[in-house]
């Protein structure tokens, strides 16, 4: 069996159906990534206070009215195909419950919002949102709302809660709301391709691994999440923004860039900045998913005063905002191919998200400490994230900085110090300091790190990866220069003692397969192999990769050879462009196991079907984001495991 059953007929409650937008496709795929490997929160959650004299019945009526107005609140998605269905307003009961609490204070709100966000939402069968009313002394004091990212983004959630708050106050709210289905026809492929080209160019021309050598725990795993709230920094930020005639959001990004440059000595790096894509008036009341990232080029002059830094960030942001509409499925595949070709995973130094309006619907914070700031941090053994994520919001009387960072980039103490240091910089600037950009890092790079043209690389980790190949007996890695074809550009040279049958191609493929799994590595530019038992006088094998202009080696193709490889190859062929011809399930020889999934023209929108086909064949063990990365199919197939057998508990056996 090499194909899945066709989707079931739409239920009678469906009023219209259609494809997911390009942005939705990413979040639809993202929901299949195991939670410890995800960075974006799913579901999103926020709250608003209940203005008196609104009652619980008023809250239910307002939520029902919003459900009728916003089709996104009654949209479900197909589990295997990028399709969405809009249902009638009364298709399901309102997903609202009530909780009695002793007091609706900051601590209670924080815990209750986190608890609601932790409850999974099934966007395939249920409304993609839920609400909870907090009741204190018999009266509703706050409404919490959580929503699935596949139909609502952060800006959309703020629009929704703001309209809920306005309706509870008796204010009029806009009647027109654009659904993502209404924007599918307006997606322009040529504009998307231009944005994707810009992204790939920026990724390839900026260093990767900027933060890694200058902090974190050596070999650290897991990640830290923290939130810093400051009332003092609110006023300081206002003063700095007026001083430099820049938006508060741009000033915070400039401060973050200044901090990275001060810490690392890098003056040119990439920031991935989230934009709302809601410039048109018709979209400002839409709660649907539209936000995407743009590549903001950070280019700072050593010694430049902060005013010059802010101006350069404003200019770079304006240039980047043209590239806010692209196809995540196509860009992720193109980046996987590029990273595998270049031998290094390209990662922006910063991911920055901000809300451009104050959320004045929030419950007022009554527990702000006397010094005007408060911080909490939590650490988890999740998969480390490869960049520094900072979310900024500016609400009534305080700013909030949410930080997520891998322990190998910043340890817990360094993560806690980051937002406090940013607020300290704002205070200095507000007091009139110039705060020039240092020419050199505050501390040198950690031992074992080398700055290649592509970015920072850990020589120790590259050596460990080489030695993890079963045919490599020993290996050393060091920078070297070969003037034969690369203009004298330094690159990594690997010297390895290997088993007699191991070739440079074998070792190179092994390194490429580890790019997405081991942070801080890149493929050597040259391999010098000495087979064990080499006869005296015989030269070692040499091999060059594409570094500094040399010709990219042609990795030989390889058909599937094991049961797991054949199962994966059959699934790839079935979901690939054109599909698999009938009757060829047992002959997927055209699939090259030495290439990654993107090399076969398969993008992330096909991965849910691919995983379902593997499950149908009796295999599991590969995460969806691993399939979308740089690893070869042969490497992925080695991780497949048989599905666990289910114990029979009586009754008829399942077919």
Which functions belong to the PLM regions below?
Residues 26, 37-47, 73-78, 119-133, ...:
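Flexible, Gly/Pro-enriched loop and linker segments at secondary-structure and domain junctions
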Residues 14-16, 33-43, 60, 71-72, ...:
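His-Asp-centered acyl/peptidyl-transfer active-site segments
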Residues 76-77, 164, 168-178, 202-211, ...:
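A short N-terminal helical cap/helix-turn-helix that marks the beginning
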Residues 2-15, 51-68, 83-125, 307-317, ...:
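A short, small/polar-residue-rich loop/turn motif at beta-strand boundaries
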Residues 1-35, 60-104, 127, 177-223, ...:
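Short amphipathic alpha-helices and their capping loops
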Residues 70, 74, 267-274, 380-442, ...:
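Extended, hydrophobic beta-loop-alpha segments that form or line the acyl/peptidyl-thioester binding
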Residues 18, 130-180, 415-428:
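Active-site-proximal acidic secondary-structure segment that organizes catalysis
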Residues 1-6, 501, 522-525, 530-655:
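Phosphopantetheine-dependent thiolation modules in NRPS/PKS and related acyl-activating systems
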């Amino acid at each position: 069996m090499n194909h899945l059953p066709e989707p079931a007929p739409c239920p009678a409650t469906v009023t219209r159906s259609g494809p997911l937008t390009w942005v939705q496709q990413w979040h639809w795929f993202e929901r299949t990534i195991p939670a410890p490997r995800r960075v974006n929160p799913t579901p999103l959650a926020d709250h608003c206070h209940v203005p008196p004299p609104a009652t619980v019945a008023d809250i239910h009526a307002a939520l029902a009215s919003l459900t009728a107005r916003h089709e996104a609140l009654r949209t479900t998605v197909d589990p295997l195909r990028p399709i969405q269905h809009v249902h009638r307003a009364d298709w399901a009961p309102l997903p609202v419950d009530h909780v009695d609490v002793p007091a609706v204070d900051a601590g209670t709100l924080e815990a209750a919002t986190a608890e609601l966000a932790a409850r999974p939402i099934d966007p395939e069968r249920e409304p993609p949102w839920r609400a909870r009313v907090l009741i204190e002394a018999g009266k509703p004091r706050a409404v919490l709302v959580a929503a699935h990212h596949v139909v609502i983004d952060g800006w959309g959630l703020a629009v929704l809660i703001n309209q809920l708050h306005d309706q509870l106050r008796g204010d009029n709210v806009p009647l027109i709301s654009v659904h993502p289905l209404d924007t599918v026809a307006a997606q322009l492929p040529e504009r998307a391709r231009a944005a994707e080209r810009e992204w790939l160019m920026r990724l390839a021309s900026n260093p990767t691994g900027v933060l890694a050598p200058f902090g974190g725990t050596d070999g650290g795993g897991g990640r830290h999440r923290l939130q810093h709230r400051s009332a003092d920094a609110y006023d300081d930020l206002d003063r700095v923004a007026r001083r430099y005639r820049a938006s508060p959001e741009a000033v915070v990004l400039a401060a973050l860039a200044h901090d990275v440059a001060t810490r690392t000595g890098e003056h040119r790096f990439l920031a991935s900045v989230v934009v709302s894509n809601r410039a048109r008036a018709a979209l400002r009341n839409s709660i649907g998913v539209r936000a995407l990232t743009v590549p903001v080029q950070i280019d700072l002059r050593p010694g430049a005063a902060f005013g010059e830094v802010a101006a350069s960030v404003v200019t770079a942001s304006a240039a980047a905002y043209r590239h806010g509409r692209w196809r995540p499925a196509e860009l992720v595949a193109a980046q996987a191919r590029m990273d595998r070709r270049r031998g290094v995973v390209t990662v922006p130094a910063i991911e920055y998200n901000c809300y451009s309006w104050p959320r004045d619907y929030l419950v007022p914070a009554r527990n702000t400490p006397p010094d005007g700031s408060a911080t909490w941090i939590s650490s988890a053994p999740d998969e480390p994230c490869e960049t520094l994520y900072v979310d900024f919001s500016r609400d009534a009387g305080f700013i909030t900085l949410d930080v997520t960072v891998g322990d190998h980039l910043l340890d817990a103490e360094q993560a806690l110090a980051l937002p406090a240091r940013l607020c300290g910089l704002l205070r200095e600037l507000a007091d009139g300091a110039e705060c020039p950009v240092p020419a050199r890092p505050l501390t040198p790079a950690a031992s074992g790190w080398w700055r290649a043209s592509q970015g920072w690389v850990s020589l120790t980790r590259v050596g460990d990866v080489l030695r993890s190949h079963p045919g490599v007996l020993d290996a050393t890695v060091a920078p070297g220069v070969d003037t034969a074809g690369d203009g004298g550009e330094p690159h990594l040279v690997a010297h390895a003692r290997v088993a007699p049958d191991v070739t440079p191609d074998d070792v190179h493929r092994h390194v490429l397969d580890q790019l997405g799994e081991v942070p801080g590595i890149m493929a050597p530019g040259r391999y010098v192999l000495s087979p064990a038992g080499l006869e005296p006088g015989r030269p070692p094998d040499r091999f060059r990769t594409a570094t500094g202009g040399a010709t990219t080696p042609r990795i030989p193709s390889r058909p599937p050879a094991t049961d797991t490889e054949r199962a994966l190859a059959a699934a790839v062929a079935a979901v690939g462009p054109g599909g698999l011809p009938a009757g060829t399930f047992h002959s997927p020889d055209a699939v090259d196991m030495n290439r990654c999934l993107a090399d076969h023209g398969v993008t992330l929108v096909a991965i849910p079907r691919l995983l379902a086909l593997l499950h149908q064949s009796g295999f599991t063990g590969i995460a969806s984001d691993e399939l979308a990365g740089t690893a070869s199919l042969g490497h992925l197939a080695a991780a497949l495991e048989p599905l666990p057998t289910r114990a029979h508990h009586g009754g008829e056996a399942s077919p």
